[in-house]
């Protein structure tokens, strides 16, 4: 199905005939400029809005448990870690790359199949109200915020604005009696501890307690079990802890979680490790936000 969506540079309505010729079964259009007499064309007021509504409708017809996450940074890495852990035991889908906006989120939800057990959906934003909007499309069962940092301040103004915007996810979760995933080491997240949640921490007051063993290639310990990864940087500590917490919460054996973390390697310029002439080079050029 081809959705004729208007963008900043192109209008999808101009490519309807080409899409049908290349095999699209139907085309959703919202412009009178499409003068093709074809039973495969469905005319609507808003192609993008139709895509979003279709994605939400599709999500309600599945039995998949949906986990939504947002944050100033670490979203994509955490999403991939959670996906890696859950996939070790369940049929899981997740957002491809960083398809985390008003178009990418619906496309991600439409990946869910009848036998998909878990779906990990990344939500991104650079203005107030966007996380709330995407959350209402996604209808998650669980919500997690990686962190709050000084990113997208052109829209959020300051750190208080970032917190207000990102916690739109938590507010929806609370209002709909779903489950928060909280990092108690983050004082902002800990404020939500009186609501339905699963939590992790370096202290003694969370559901899952972790200890950082190594900050070069991140290794952590929960109870007497050690989890090793191929990920560099102690800034990834909470990302790994979140993935382990979710895996343990859903009953995945610790050995499977260990194997999943051992197999995961970062790509696409995100703390990516390159071996050149016997030297290890860490390529971390993807993100330019100052957090």
Question: PLM features: what roles do these ranges have?
Answer:
Residues 45, 96, 200-204:
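Residues at the C-termini of beta-strands that transition into short coil/loop
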Residues 269, 287-291:
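Glycine-rich phosphate/pyrophosphate-binding beta-alpha loops
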Residues 29-38, 144-280:
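Acidic, Mg2+-coordinating active-site environments of NTP-dependent enzymes
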Residues 23, 139, 265:
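Conserved functional loop/turn residues at catalytic and ligand-binding sites
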Residues 1-53, 232, 252:
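N-terminal leader/targeting and accessory segments in enzymes
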Residues 10-13, 102-103, 128, 156, ...:
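Loop/helix-junction capping segments adjacent to catalytic residues or to phosphate/diphosphate-binding pockets
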Residues 48-184, 188-196, 241, 247-248:
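Phosphate-binding loop of NTP-binding sites
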